[in-house]
Amino acid sequence: MYPAGNLFIQVAHGQLEAILKEPGSAPVRGVALVLHPHPLGGGTMHNKVVFRAASALNDAGLVTLRINFRGVGQSTGTHDQGRGELDDVRAGLDYFRDKYADRRITICGFSFGARVGLEVGTSDDRVLNLISIGTPVDQYDFSFLLACRKPILFVHGDRDEFGNLGDLRSLVAQVKENAPAELAVIKNADHFFEGHLDELKRVITDWTARQLS
């Protein structure tokens, strides 16, 4: 049984359950919204990849906000196939606007969370940096990223079951024409980075620290 969130964000459909965490002893250098994988596959803000990603961002000096999308945990509403979830992402950004108005915002999403987070983050001027973990290029259309002009990190396992690495390399090459994009490939890692979570965390912390330097 996972603990309940320590924060509830009020939204049109009721509330979003969330966990807000400040960096430990490090000075606050920004904020990050961290988004979980597909709810119908059991994805929640307590997912191991999401937890490690948030920890990596905390280590880099960012306040992290993990939310449960609508219909997950104590969040109200029902799953909306990635449409209503876009508004959930915007609600997280609104929270940062109200509570951390002067801080730079990063969106970090895993799998389904990457899909909806990248779509909002590409066009929302409040977001400066993007991180996409386990980008499910075999499942969704990511052509909207061709309009991206922001620094973006893709972290992918070369054994990912939901995102062909060759297809992702092609996408990243196209994104690089307009944005500073990087692809970090973790050898022998599957979609959930089993046995490679420490490496995933290190990649995210290092890239984020460089963006904020």
Regions found by a protein language model. Name each.
Residues 173-192:
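Catalytic histidine neighborhood in serine/cysteine hydrolases
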Residues 158-163, 191-192:
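Acidic catalytic loop of the alpha/beta-hydrolase fold
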Residues 77, 189-201:
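Catalytic histidine-centered segment of alpha/beta-hydrolase-like enzymes
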Residues 24-66:
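Short, surface-exposed "cap/lid" segments of acyl-processing enzymes
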